[in-house]
Amino acid sequence: HYCFFDYKKEQYGLDWNAIYDKYSRQIADDMTDNQLFEVLGNMLGELKDGHVNMYSSWDVARNWSWHENYPSNLSDTLINRYLGTDYRISSGMRYRILDDNIGYIRLQSFASSMGEGNLDEILYYLMPCNALIIDIRDNGGGLVTSAEQLAARFTNTPLLVGYMQHKTGRGHSDFS
């Protein structure tokens, strides 16, 4: 169900069928679960995609180089200076009122859902502020619905935020 085969082929010549052939030769009936996990993890690593992971009860196969080579777009020192330790936490958001009556929300991930009640409380607390900073730098992503839910609090107008494609068949390019 991977949607980026064509893109990866264009970007760096990925030939998934050749990769399949390469790694299928390394799989044997007498392999342990750990050995199979390692081979399949290495195979998925060929995709060079930080969003492709394989989970087992003992480990997660992931593309570490994607995370390690991802350019940092923030300074922990700067975050600590502004956010400090006197902040509130709700639904994965850290928030506080900064000097000059500026509201600040730090959102490092959209991995979990935000409760409407939690958002109500946070925004009510920050309502008297003269301005609001929503800091999503270094956000690892997650649920599109969480990002939409937060953004919807700042407009009354329906707004197109993107498109999604769904897998419709077994072929590499079978998407809606």
State the predicted function of each range.
Residues H1-S176:
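Flexible, low-complexity junctional segments that flank or bridge functional domains
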